[in-house]
């Protein structure tokens, strides 16, 4: 039996509503299922956050979750999203496999 693959999704969120973020995320998850039949998606969309949470708080929490991932998946637009860029640097520096939305074109 194949091993479960833990996937962290790095997704630009600035300027998007919670609904837009969740819709994009659900679409990506459905596409990932064809590449990873035994995938566990690490939930990194924070719904219950401190009311005064700053962007760096979210990034810190995301990096903690990312440490559990086998693969970090980068949604389109990650190159211009500050948090996604930092997550990308962390994945590369710490040897976590990366995958990009353009990889799902097939």
How would you name each of these model-derived features?
Residues 1-106:
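Conserved catalytic or regulatory cores that recognize and/or transform ribose-phosphate-containing ligands
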């Amino acid at each position: 039996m194949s091993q479960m693959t833990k996937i962290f999704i790095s997704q630009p969120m600035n300027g998007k509503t919670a609904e837009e973020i969740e819709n994009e995320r659900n679409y990506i998850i459905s596409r990932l299922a064809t590449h990873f039949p035994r995938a566990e998606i690490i939930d990194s969309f924070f719904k219950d956050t401190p009311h005064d949470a700053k962007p760096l708080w979210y990034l810190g929490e995301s990096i903690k979750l990312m440490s559990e991932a086998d693969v970090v998946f980068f949604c389109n637009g990650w190159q211009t999203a500050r948090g996604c860029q930092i997550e990308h640097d962390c994945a590369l520096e710490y040897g976590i496999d990366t995958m990009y939305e353009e990889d799902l074109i097939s």
